[in-house]
Amino acid sequence: MNQIRTIGIIMDGNRRWTEKRGLSRLAGHRHGAKKLRELLGWARGAGVETVIVYAFSTENWRRTKTEVSFLFKLFRRFLTVEIDSLVADKTIFRCIGDRYSLPEDLQSAIAKAEARTKNLGPRTLVIAVSYGGRAEIVAAAKVFARRYQDQLNAAGEKEFSQGLATAGLPDPDLILRTGGEQRLSNFLPWQSVYSELVFTPTHWPALTRKEFINILEEVRNRDRRFGK
């Protein structure tokens, strides 16, 4: 039986969930943030140590200013309200993505949360904000070229991965996407090469603990060969 210690989650379907209920898009994101809090508890109970969530992609900047501002407001609130819970649960918080494109007050809140939790563990929560997988690989390639310019032939994948935003973290055992779409949408392209993939039609706010646990059980029973 496979161990599932690290999962990546593409939290999709907030807006479609609200449309079916006659609610505003912003209400969908609010419910989505609540679902993340619930899922962290489910994951902890199931023995998952690292959760990486795709909260805001580089492409999401194309959304309306109102929606983007509201998403950042939710993120600030999450950091403010949940930081004590993360500390109590001995959870390290990390943020990956182009944080310097974010509002300065949000950058500050991220830095404070990271500093407060950096010496905790064994659990880790990683939130990808203003993140794009291709941009991450390009940035890692630049780091790699600087570090190993005189010894390129002696360096390989392990050395390259040290320049990724997720350096020091295990690759995901599972990537789960809610909302029905069946693609990774630029989420962890380097790290997901041997991840098990699950696409559920359930919209993110509607995900239940029962479905989440069933997904983990199904993946635990898959035959993972890692190319062998």
What are these regions (language model features)?
Residues 1-228:
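Flexible, compositionally biased loop and terminal segments
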